[in-house]
A protein has these predicted regions:
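Extracytoplasmic "Venus flytrap"
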Residues: 44-73, 77, 81, 86-101, ...
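Bacterial lipoprotein signal-peptidase II cleavage site
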Residues: 28-37
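N-terminal secretory signal peptides
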Residues: 1-7, 15-27
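Hinge/cleft segment of the Venus flytrap/periplasmic-binding protein
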Residues: 37-53, 186-190, 194, 294, ...
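Short, solvent-exposed amphipathic alpha-helices that sit
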Residues: 66-79, 161-168, 193-211, 229, ...
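Hydrophobic alpha-helical segments within soluble ligand-binding/sensing domains
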Residues: 98, 154-180, 225-227, 273-278, ...
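Hydrophobic alpha-helical
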Residues: 115-132, 202, 219-279
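Flexible loop/hinge segments that line or gate small-molecule binding clefts
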Residues: 121-160, 179-182, 275-287
Length: 349
């Protein structure tokens, strides 16, 4: 498999339509011929090479550790399959540019599309355009407005993420017989549905245990905002028993604020599953005792599913002949006891 380098954004803008579809794409191209057609339905070994296919991929700019891992994982998964050509657009947070890039993939007649939209609502129409053109779409994480825009959705469970964080904290506090605990929360961007779902799950789990959320701030999924908002929370809350931070990328700043404030009287739970948080959990020398997964490994699964869709193949061990319409990943709680088990899905933040 050979890889052509990405064309920069400036190159795309200057090249214009004359450059055509190739200006938007980078291809990992296999020169190995297919050895057999993949079987139809659920039977057979999915690891065996099937017919050659091209998978188009589009995601936002890799300006966040989690998003960077999404693209990295997708590419790495595609490289495992000798018969797969992987055409990826340059990541962008410009909705109109992402739409244009997906349209180029459609015009290039890729066999399957994997799309993590910067804005699910805004890219719904182009997802449906692909489906109408006979190109199945794997909608990754940020969901389109209608199932008509995708063949299969795969993503995380934001509500369950909050539930599992709250349940873990409640269990730890009850084991220590902490009465009337003060439980803080460093949320992500409050206007986003995903943040609202995470917070609701957290609140519901604590309420089930007879607890409630105390001091709460919202950050922007960045280390800088995490540090600033956590510093504000710690200044207003002179005592804490537990703290949940929604996102391990902003958790870099959250941890810095905790260290700067020289606070260690509480336990902290992170969110998503970054490598550095897993290292802190394993070392067990800071307030960080767990993180709740929202793993970018879902991108690897999305590409594997795209390959099967393109080859008309089901999942080998499943009784059903077709790829499921929806797959929701599980938000496992990573602790000192099981961190080695999950180290392979940790991402750089």
């Amino acid at each position: 498999m050979t890889t052509q380098p990405f064309l920069g954004r400036r190159g795309f803008l200057l090249g214009g339509a004359a450059v055509g579809a190739g200006a938007l794409l980078t291809a990992c191209t296999s020169n190995t011929p297919a050895t057999q057609d993949a079987p139809v339905g659920g039977a057979g070994n999915n690891a065996q090479p099937g017919k050659p296919i091209t998978i188009g991929f589009s995601a936002p700019a890799a300006d966040h550790g989690w998003i960077a891992a999404i693209t990295k994982n997708a590419r790495a998964q595609a490289q495992k399959f000798s018969e797969v050509t992987f055409n990826a657009t340059e990541g962008t947070n410009d909705v109109n540019q992402q739409i244009s890039q997906v349209e180029t993939l459609i015009n290039a007649k890729v066999n399957v599309l994997v799309i993590l939209p910067f804005d699910g609502k805004a890219l719904t129409a182009v997802g449906q355009q692909a489906m109408d053109a006979g190109i199945p779409v794997i909608n990754l994480d940020r969901v389109f407005d209608t199932p008509l825009a995708y063949r299969t959705w795969i993503g995380g469970d934001n509500y369950r993420m909050g539930v599992n964080a709250g349940s873990y904290i409640a269990k730890q506090l009850k084991a220590k017989n902490v009465a009337n605990p003060i439980i803080g929360e460093v949320a992500g961007i409050d206007s986003l549905p995903l943040t609202q779902e995470r917070s609701k799950g957290f609140t519901d789990a604590l309420a089930k245990a007879g607890y409630k959320v105390g001091p709460r701030v919202s950050a922007q999924f960045t280390p800088e905002s995490g540090e600033q908002q956590t510093a504000n929370l710690l200044q207003s809350a002179t005592k804490l028993d537990a703290l949940w931070n929604h996102d391990d990328d902003q958790g870099v700043g959250v941890n810095a604020a905790i260290e700067n404030a020289k606070r260690s009287e509480f336990l902290m739970v992170g969110g998503a599953g970054s490598k550095n948080m897993m290292t802190l959990i394993k070392n067990d020398s800071s307030p960080i005792k767990a993180t709740v997964l929202y793993s970018p490994s879902m991108a690897s699964t999305a590409v594997a599913l795209a390959r099967l869709l393109g080859q008309g193949t089901g999942i080998g061990e499943f009784a059903e002949h077709d790829i499921p319409a929806e797959i929701t990943t599980y938000s496992a709680v990573v602790t000192k006891e099981n961190v080695d088990q999950y180290a392979d899905v940790g991402f750089d933040s």
